């Protein structure tokens, strides 16, 4: 009898409160080194604090997708996820760079522009 009660309680606990809450991604776009026109650099898009883990992240140059590398998907202590997408680039003062994020918590893609002065 005690075994049945324990199994029922375990079943009820598994149904309540364990479902993860969707979380909107936070996006940071930055270069590895201070921007200098004509000098090679690395552009990073760090996306954190999101759940569920399915996400699309693109770096854009003048609105066009760039070839990128990405870190492995990882999670924080609070079970939210984070990911780094990066590529090499050479700023020139004319081209516009941004990061586009698509996630189930967002109605429309989130686009964050790179601010060369940060």
UniProtKB/Swiss-Prot annotation:
Belongs to the beta-2-microglobulin family. This is Beta-2-microglobulin. Residues 1-20 form the signal peptide. Residues 22-115 form the Ig-like C1-type domain. Heterodimer of an alpha chain and a beta chain. Beta-2-microglobulin is the beta-chain of major histocompatibility complex class I molecules. One of its GO terms (biological process) is antigen processing and presentation of exogenous peptide antigen via MHC class II. It is found in: Secreted. The keyword Disulfide bond applies. It comes from Equus caballus. It comes from the Eukaryota. GO terms for cellular component: extracellular region; late endosome membrane; lysosomal membrane; MHC class I protein complex; MHC class II protein complex. CDD domains: IgC1_beta2m. Its main location: secreted. SMART domains: IGc1 (SM00407). Disulfide bonds join 45-99. Component of the class I major histocompatibility complex (MHC). Involved in the presentation of peptide antigens to the immune system. One of its GO terms (molecular function) is peptide antigen binding. The lineage of its organism: Eukaryota, Metazoa, Chordata, Craniata, Vertebrata. Keywords: Disulfide bond, Immunity, Immunoglobulin domain, MHC I, Secreted, Signal.
């Amino acid at each position: 009898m005690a075994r049945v009660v324990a199994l029922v309680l375990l079943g009820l606990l598994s149904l309540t409160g364990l479902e993860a809450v969707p979380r909107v991604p936070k996006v940071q776009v930055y270069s590895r080194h201070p921007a200098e026109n004509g000098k090679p650099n690395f552009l990073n898009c760090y996306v954190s604090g999101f759940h569920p883990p399915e996400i699309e992240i693109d770096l854009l140059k003048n609105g066009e997708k760039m070839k990128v590398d990405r870190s492995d998907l990882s999670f924080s202590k609070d079970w939210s996820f984070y990911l780094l997408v990066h590529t090499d680039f050479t700023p020139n003062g004319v081209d516009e760079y941004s990061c586009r994020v698509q996630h189930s918590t967002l109605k429309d893609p989130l686009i964050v522009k790179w601010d060369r002065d940060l």
